[in-house]
């Protein structure tokens, strides 16, 4: 089958042919329709330090997808041939304390599709049936293909009650921009997002941001004053991994505020702990998606009017994958879709 793989220890990916995956007793085989390019895939493309330490070579990658079940293992129940599915990209052990307690997103033995094992940038993907998630017919293939990052945004944004709250989001990548739409959808009052990328800040405005602030030109304090915010933000969502953005977020929080961290800052990042301690801030780390509560909430929000369509800005046939990666690398894109229909 055709697949997009890391064949050598260096930058780039190669469209090549690999063996079709075998289907285990508890697996489903998915014929891929659409995939989306993730920030993780950009790390793999660049072959940065993280990728060099993490990605086995050779291996085909990718973990954002939608497709159709074409084969099932003999032990699979609850699915049928022809079901349209996306899937949870974190494969968990099922036996550790967190898995057995229903907290699979905290499994210490997690294996990542397209990171630690063969991925979805291929004509076919085999995964445990447990990880597959049926997509309702009213949700498009394009939106279903981005359920993985949509889930990151949902898990982060819904970590705290947002109804009537003032929310600060630092980092206007696709996940941060989707978090804007989620926060507004569930009832936040002011949703302010910061970045230095005008293209993505404009996307955030289209997704409903109260203010989208280019911090290289505009003061967050001035924006807060314009919005008549006298006490600070109630909830902060850190999506950038940029130390200066995290510092600004902490300084802008109200006393008793709540902070969710999805962005990954450098390991030795220093912060002003006075901001945390004397303000009584609650800080929560976010990894992946809650299985499968996050997935059900994603569907419910889309079915109740959440519009994420502006976040999908580019579409390419898989044979033009280099154009797709170029769009992502340019910084002037939202989500980029690769179409496998003609593969």
Curated annotation (Swiss-Prot):
Top-rank taxon, per record: Bacteria
Keyword NAD: yes
Single GO MF annotation: zinc ion binding
Location of the active site: 40, 43
Chain residues that bind NAD(+): 175, 195, 200, 262-264, 286-287
UniProt-listed Pfam families: ADH_N (PF08240), ADH_zinc_N (PF00107)
Cofactor binding description: Binds 2 Zn(2+) ions per subunit.
Keywords (A to Z) from UniProt: Cytoplasm, Metal-binding, NAD, Oxidoreductase, Zinc
E.C. numbers: 1.1.1.103
Cellular component terms (Gene Ontology): cytoplasm
Residues with site note (Important for catalytic activity for the proton relay mechanism but does not participate directly in the coordination of zinc atom): 148
Binding-site positions, Zn(2+) 1: 38, 63-64
Pathway annotation from the record: Amino-acid degradation; L-threonine degradation via oxydo-reductase pathway; glycine from L-threonine: step 1/2
Compartment(s) of residence: Cytoplasm
InterPro entries: ADH-like_C, ADH-like_N, ADH_Zn_CS, GroES-like_sf, L-Threonine_3-DHase, NAD(P)-bd_dom_sf, PKS_ER, Zn_alcohol_dh
Catalytically driven reaction(s): L-threonine + NAD(+) = (2S)-2-amino-3-oxobutanoate + NADH + H(+)
A single GO BP: L-threonine catabolic process to glycine
Cofactor(s) the protein requires to work: Zn(2+)
Subunit structure: Homotetramer.
Its biological purpose: Catalyzes the NAD(+)-dependent oxidation of L-threonine to 2-amino-3-ketobutyrate.
Family: Belongs to the zinc-containing alcohol dehydrogenase family.
The name this protein goes by in its record: L-threonine 3-dehydrogenase
The organism of origin for this protein: Burkholderia thailandensis (strain ATCC 700388 / DSM 13276 / CCUG 48851 / CIP 106301 / E264)
Gene (UniProt): tdh
């Amino acid at each position: 089958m055709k697949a997009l793989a890391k064949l050598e220890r260096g930058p780039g990916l190669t469209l090549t042919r690999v063996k079709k995956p075998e289907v285990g007793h508890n697996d489903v085989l998915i014929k891929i329709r659409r995939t989306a390019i993730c920030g993780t895939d950009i790390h793999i493309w660049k072959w940065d330090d993280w990728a060099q330490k993490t990605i086995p070579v050779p291996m085909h990658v990718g973990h954002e997808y939608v497709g159709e079940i074409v084969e099932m293992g003999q032990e699979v129940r609850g699915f049928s041939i022809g079901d349209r599915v996306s899937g949870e990209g974190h494969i968990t052990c099922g036996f550790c304390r967190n898995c057995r307690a229903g907290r699979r997103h905290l499994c210490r033995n997690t294996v990542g599709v397209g990171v630690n094992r063969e991925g979805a940038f291929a004509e076919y993907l085999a995964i445990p049936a447990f990880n597959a998630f049926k997509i309702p017919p009213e949700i498009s293939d394009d939106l279903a293909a981005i359920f993985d990052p949509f889930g990151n945004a949902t898990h982060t944004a819904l970590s705290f009650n947002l109804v009537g709250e003032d929310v600060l989001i630092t980092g206007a990548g696709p996940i941060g921009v989707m978090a804007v739409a989620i926060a507004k959808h569930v009832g936040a009052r002011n949703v302010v997002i910061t970045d230095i990328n005008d293209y993505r800040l404009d996307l955030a405005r289209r997704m409903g941001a109260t203010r989208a602030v280019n911090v290289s030109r505009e003061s967050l304090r001035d924006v807060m004053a314009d919005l008549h915010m006298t006490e600070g933000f109630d909830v902060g969502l850190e999506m950038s991994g940029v130390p200066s953005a995290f510092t600004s977020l902490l300084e802008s929080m109200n006393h008793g505020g709540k902070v969710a961290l999805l962005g990954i800052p450098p390991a030795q990042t220093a912060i002003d702990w006075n901001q945390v301690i004397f303000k009584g801030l609650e800080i929560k780390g976010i990894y992946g998606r809650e299985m499968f509560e996050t997935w059900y909430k994603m569907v419910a929000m889309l079915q109740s009017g959440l519009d994420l369509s502006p976040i999908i800005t580019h579409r390419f046939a898989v044979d033009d994958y280099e154009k797709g990666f170029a769009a992502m690398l340019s910084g002037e894109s939202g989500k980029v879709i690769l179409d496998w229909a003609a593969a």
